[in-house]
Amino acid sequence: MARAKFERTKPHVNIGTIGHVDHGKTTLTAAITMTLAAQGKAKARNYEDIDAAPEEKARGITINTAHVEYETDSRHYAHVDCPGHADYVKNMITGAAQMDGGILVVSAADGPMPQTREHILLAKQVGVPNLVVFLNKQDMVDDEELLELVELEVRELLTEYGFDGDNIPIVAGSALQAVEALKANPKIAKGDNEWTDKILALMDEVDAYIPEPEREIDKPFLMAVEDVFSISGRGTVATGRIERGKVKVGETVEIVGIRATSSTTVTGVEMFQKTLEEGLAGDNVGLLLRGVKKEDIERGMVIAKPGSITPHTQFEGEVYVLTKEEGGRHTPFFKNYKPQFYVRTTDVTGSIVDYTSDEGETVEMVMPGDRIKMTVELINPIAIEQGMRFAIREGGRTIGAGVVSKILK
């Protein structure tokens, strides 16, 4: 049989498994690929393959992540699974593997544990909009009431962190039983095995509950300025990569950040020395701007659809601080520490006003390897939005990675 080529006919969604260590995230990932492989919609991956996740670098941080892909009748999924807890924290904060939704795995035998709580909090902070729950290890719970109790506990926890705990789909099953059954018979059809059917039921919920993400090209236009030069007789050109949306010749745009916001008209879009009618998300372009002097615009500003983004100086961020081994600091830092915040294309000096723990208590000292919530005050206003990623740098080296969880001012 000839190999079918990859058809981009189905909508694509990025998801991942989250939850406490040893609750069965990787086993579930294996079970999903094996169950869907039995229907010809995935390549079966066993636990060992997924667990030996390769190292990746994102924003100067090493993260172990396994990527698998599979399809359901209606969608194509890219699924990430991390072997270690620290990898999850780094992955979610750096956005190395963007998630449109997550499958929260909770062991029915143990109920929610500290990392269950931490991953739900992180999902909320970094903007993973929707979760579906898999209550794993159902085969180890004989008492139906106990299962209901765990479900209730999970729903309360989700509600506590601002998710729709009452309506989030929860499916109980056993990833291990499904994997064992599929090892014995890789071609199990729907309806032949209660455990693999539960995996299919979970995927039905994921299909139905996790909405399709808005495509980058459909979002409002934004390009971070990387370089600026003047072309005599034509005006000023700002270059950069279009982060989202599209821009056409003749459109009005705003220049945001560092100085007062100004507006101008795009009189030309160029790519590789060729003129275009429009630039699209992902393109590296030069924009010719009417009536803008070279000194009016600099790296670190953004050019965006009018009214779509505003400059700010104060925000709350969820930050992972690099360890010494990762090339971070060797010593802790304290309040009023003044590093550089690298946002999109530029470093801006800022001062850290305070630190807060997950429990909402003030923290005096932050150690390398910590994850912490911090309030940052920048010396210059720049275009910032919720969910935006940034790096914290000191003398040109990255010492932390963060995501904006709330804009204050």
From Swiss-Prot:
It is found in: Cytoplasm. Residues 174-176 are annotated as: G5. Residues 136-139 are annotated as: G4. GTP binds at residues 19-26, 81-85, 136-139. It is an enzyme of class 3 (hydrolase). Its main location: cytoplasm. It holds the Pfam family GTP_EFTU_D2. Mg(2+) binds at T26. Keywords: Cytoplasm, Elongation factor, GTP-binding, Hydrolase, Magnesium, Metal-binding, Nucleotide-binding, Protein biosynthesis. HAMAP family: EF_Tu_B (MF_00118_B). Belongs to the TRAFAC class translation factor GTPase superfamily. Classic translation factor GTPase family. EF-Tu/EF-1A subfamily. This is Elongation factor Tu. It comes from Rippkaea orientalis (strain PCC 8801 / RF-1). The gene is tuf.
